């Protein structure tokens, strides 16, 4: 009888353990599905700790080798014959002096004296009334946040596109930070907030396509920045102009411990010329919910023969504005779409998009409100 009781106790414990682990795993899977962005951040933080530990071990090993090498000093300033010192020396970048004289007939330089580098990023909430009052003193800002320098010819005319839904507390912080920085960089710019209405899952990529089309109707732009509203640059030398290749500006996010999550990461803030964006047929429209659209954009860029450039060193650091909203649910169909990126590139994008926007021009930005639905971007079989 006592043996039977012990067996029952063991059986009950096993059952309770099974129920506990089943409940725990189910809760974890549900959390990953409904809040994939947060779950992904936590996962990468754990991975980043491992990466940092391995890098520290490598650094210690390298310092020991330098110390024991007769031809090397501890700080690495003297190198063994034939060694490539470019791995150790950082090339300095010269910026123009304070007394530099601008010319309204010449292009604005890219390395201006007012670009100091590190920015003190303040993510404290501020009201739109305060922001409007602050920038009302700048009479050069036209409706829609359109600004251009007067002391030189802007090297780039930049349309900043911001996909948006229910982040009203972020917009004032964003403008408070970005407007002065872009003015320092002597770029011509304006802001377009593309707001998704309705009940469909958030479609960041389709919003960018809508914003691009409307911005092209509004003015003559040659550079487009695709910018998440909760990402703030920490360095004003991160120049928001475009180049011969597409640019990934947000290479080091604080929420990822300032480490690039993976080589093909193209999220947060990116920039393409108008010609480049049209050549790749824009973003895909088929990604509803969280994840995948940036990876598809990376594929499109490479299929079109481009490479992606990134800022050097700490220039690509960004701070994320904290938010209290539940993130979008995970888009489980993204893996199939990514598998057929090449086949879909020229049948899903700028060329198959239908929409009806409502446009409101604010003092600091143009608001493009649109109710997105899958039938607005029909896709042929591939």
From Swiss-Prot:
Transmembrane segments: 15-35
Catalytic activity: a beta-D-glucosyl-(1<->1')-N-acylsphing-4-enine + UDP-alpha-D-galactose = a beta-D-Gal-(1->4)-beta-D-Glc-(1<->1)-Cer(d18:1(4E)) + UDP + H(+)
Disulfide cross-links: 108-152, 223-242
Tissue spec: High expression in brain and adrenal gland, lower in liver, lung, colon and peripheral white blood cells.
Amino-acid positions noted as binding N-acetyl-D-glucosamine in the UniProt annotation, renumbered to this chain: 292-295, 334
Pathway connected to this protein: Protein modification; protein glycosylation; Sphingolipid metabolism
EC number(s) from the headed UniProt entry: 2.4.1.-, 2.4.1.274
Means of activity regulation: Inhibited by EDTA.
Subcellular location: Golgi apparatus, Golgi stack membrane
Topological domains, Lumenal: 36-382
Glycosylation sites: 71, 75, 83-84, 99, 122, 307, 367
Residue positions binding UDP-alpha-D-galactose: 163-167, 202-204, 229-230, 258, 290, 323-324
List of residues binding Mn(2+): 230, 323
Required co-factors: Mn(2+); Mg(2+)
Entries under InterPro entries matching the protein: Galactosyl_T, Galactosyl_T_C, Galactosyl_T_N, Nucleotide-diphossugar_trans
Single GO BP term: lactosylceramide biosynthetic process
Recorded superkingdom: Eukaryota
Cytoplasmic side: 1-14
Protein's name in the database: Beta-1,4-galactosyltransferase 6
Organism: Homo sapiens
Lineage, highest ranks first: Eukaryota, Metazoa, Chordata, Craniata, Vertebrata
Gene: B4GALT6
